[in-house]
Amino acid sequence: MIRYLTSGESHGPSLVAIVEGVPAGLALHPDDLNIHLQRRQQGYGRGNRMKIESDKAEILSGVRFGYTIGSPISFAIKNKDWANWTNKMNQFENPSEPVATIDIPRPGHADFSGRIKYGFNDIRPVIERSSARETAARVGACSISRKFLHDLGIEIGSYVSAIGQAFETEPNHHAVKILEKGAETLMHEADESPVRMLNKDLEKQAMELIDTAKKAGDTLGGIVEVFVTGLPIGLGSYVQYDRRLGADLGAAILSIQAVKGFEIGHAFKNAVSFGSEVHDEFYLDKNGNPQRKTNRAGGLEGGMTNGETLHLRVAMKPIATLMSPLSSFDFKTMSPAASHIERSDTCAVPACGVIAESVIAPVLANAILEKFGGDTINETKLRLDNYTQKGK
């Protein structure tokens, strides 16, 4: 089973991750992580922090001569901005100059609950770990599982279907057509857009909305469509609640900072439709093989993959740090106050797509390993190939 831990503060020296359970023999290079770290930093509406950092993973263990060796893989990503925060974020030495505490929580952030939960007299420690900067370490860690899946012929991609009121009003047939070539083809086309949209008119609207929000000191959220192609039938299980693949995918997606909603396929539209309008009918092709007319279920039925493209929809709320602050209060004086302002993005929905692609990779890799096993990637691949050949 693949599992990972991340460590590090937003303005500390480094972000660190340890990934355990990766089969031996997987070809792995730092660029397999760095390409997605760079993608995470892109997107119209990002803040000044992304102009400072150029995230690159330094792999420290678990790889020899370019191949995984079955032991835990560790890596570090240096925070360049640490040089500007050594006084405020020093691990051991008392600050050389007084450091002001942060006492006013931001509505919508972890500030309020985190300060009370951990008994801090300063919100700064909460901000440092709850920050979405942590997702750089997660994208790096999950990129290893992503490479494992890629080498098994399984591809992950995404695009943005909504930013604020700039949203798709009908199914994107262009996306469906691209997916015939694999989810990574979709990913590359989306990456050509500053907001990772496939519709140029919508892209223009979204960028104008981001400009408007930035001028107003406001923020924007949106919706990301995530797809996975090449999955075999039968990953997950209906036998027990905790083996249903959709539950694990939901947990991974909802662990992303600012993500508040998740659906598989057209779940919410399906919920208000007749069953005859929802379920994906079968037909037999000219070779007598069963096919589907539609994919409204999003590639999952009964907690298992059904051979269709996996389709997840991810709802990201607007970022909680507003340059035109909302109403709050001061913990020290217990009097009304404008909420704290922290350097932030106006819109991070494009980055959310990259993060969502990443966090589902270990879930899918573990589903593969649960079904097919293998201490080496060659063992896993052989068993997967035998299984898929039998299904043809």
Curated annotation (Swiss-Prot):
Cofactor (UniProt): FMNH2
Source superkingdom: Bacteria
SS bonds (residue pairs): none
GO term, biological process aspect, one: amino acid biosynthetic process
InterPro entries according to UniProt: Chorismate_synth (IPR000453), Chorismate_synth_AroC_sf (IPR035904), Chorismate_synthase_CS (IPR020541)
EC number: 4.2.3.5
Reactions the enzyme catalyzes: 5-O-(1-carboxyvinyl)-3-phosphoshikimate = chorismate + phosphate
List of residues binding FMN: 129-131, 257-258, 302, 317-321, 343
One annotated Gene Ontology cellular component of this protein: cytosol
Catalytic EC class: lyase
UniProt pathway: Metabolic intermediate biosynthesis; chorismate biosynthesis; chorismate from D-erythrose 4-phosphate and phosphoenolpyruvate: step 7/7
Any one Gene Ontology molecular-function term assigned to this protein's record: chorismate synthase activity
Positions with a binding annotation for NADP(+): 40, 46
Cofactor detail note: Reduced FMN (FMNH(2)).
Function per UniProt: This reaction introduces a second double bond into the aromatic ring system.
HAMAP family: Chorismate_synth
Assembly notes: Homotetramer.
Family: Belongs to the chorismate synthase family.
Record protein name field: Chorismate synthase
Organismal lineage: Bacteria, Pseudomonadati, Chlorobiota, Chlorobiia, Chlorobiales
